[in-house]
Amino acid sequence: MKAICVNFGPQHPAAHGVLRLILQLNGEVVEKMDIHIGLLHRGSEKLMETKPYLQSMPYFDRLDYVSMMVQEHAYCLAIEALLNTTNYTANFVLVRTMFDELTRILNHMLAIACHALDIGSMSSIFWAFEEREKIMEFYERVCGRRMHAAFYRPNEVNLNFLSVKLLTDILEFNNNCLTTLSEMHNILTYNKIWKQRLVNIGSISYKDCLDFGLTGVMARSTGIKRDLRMDAFDTYANYYYLNFRSYTGQAGDSYDRFLIRMNEMSESINIISQAIFKLTTSKNTCSPASILKALNKKKFISQTYKNEYSSMEKLITHFKYWSEGFKIQSNWTYQAVESPKGEFGVTLVSDGSNKPYRCKVRSPAYHHLQVLPKMSKGHLLADLSALIGTIDIVFGEIDR
């Protein structure tokens, strides 16, 4: 049979963005694949070199625009490492941990729902998007924006709108989300058609993970026990002091990756509940006034006063801080976080000015996309949509 070449995307609904694949097919079996990326390139890393450190923060929301706050966290950790002000126990770190896990649920809900929709199950997308809408509302309540939050800041988060009512609502969301997860388990996990479409499809080995630099769910599905949140040396935020577990698979196939994502959402709910308990029972209350008082003692934090607009000198100081930003002495650092897709890292090089000399982003989805030709070889064209869904790619962070 003569091999034929087919374009898959970039307009295909299962391409999850602007992905263009040139496929060589033998009948309906994929023999070769050529991936074309770069259709969403905006030069984000170069633009960061032209802005003060704080003003580069919103660029990270626009990389992987499904897991926004986790990427802000990586950038904040990089700046804090350069300033030598890394903190693991403060209240604002607990708030970051809580919103990181809310973001993880946000990402996995979309990944699983769209994956199911690609294969033909419509029910789960309605349940998942209802839960995502609630998380978007929490985003909006703390920072005014639903997607591009710009909520985290070096050595602090915007605590002005954090309230006991918000924490109560998040706890209520946790209970409802567990019900939704059990409904999704019932309709997908034990579904015969779903298992036939995923089991032994797109299997990868331990060696493939090392060769292609796979991290996160992709690596854990093969049995690699690597989770930055639980790593004794690479841990960050408040995860070291929390009680949770990380899940691994054995087969390295699409079904294992689906199960890991489902279980991770349950663990995220557990972590959020622990973070809220710590916030509400700690000696330092969670009121913005008391936290601002503690923050003002730090050297690299904006001095926030009630009367900063009543004094000329304080107004000038306030204006200079937010327009010029702080200067960081020459140094470099690499800081990574466990994003929903894998290890999201930021390499930051400072040269003594108020702008980064270089900011390099390590996006996990870029590495995961490279393994797609090997995963899809020998599979049917119909399985390709299942494979693209299971590697969970977003082109904002691939093309940057």
From Swiss-Prot:
Gene Ontology terms for molecular function: NAD binding; NADH dehydrogenase (ubiquinone) activity; quinone binding
The reaction(s) this protein catalyses: a ubiquinone + NADH + 5 H(+)(in) = a ubiquinol + NAD(+) + 4 H(+)(out)
Cited Pfam families: Complex1_49kDa (PF00346)
EC number: 7.1.1.2
Family from the record: Belongs to the complex I 49 kDa subunit family.
Record SUPFAM superfamilies: HydB/Nqo4-like
Organism: Paramecium tetraurelia
UniProt cross-references to PANTHER family, sorted A to Z: NADH DEHYDROGENASE [UBIQUINONE] IRON-SULFUR PROTEIN 2, MITOCHONDRIAL, NADH-UBIQUINONE OXIDOREDUCTASE 49 KDA SUBUNIT
Top-rank taxon, per record: Eukaryota
The keyword Oxidoreductase appears for this protein: yes
Gene Ontology terms: cellular component: mitochondrion
Main localization (coarse): mitochondrion
Keywords noted in UniProt: Electron transport, Mitochondrion, NAD, Oxidoreductase, Respiratory chain, Translocase, Transport, Ubiquinone
Name the record gives this protein: NADH-ubiquinone oxidoreductase 49 kDa subunit
Disulfide bond entries: none
Subcellular localization: Mitochondrion
Gene that this sequence comes from: NAD7
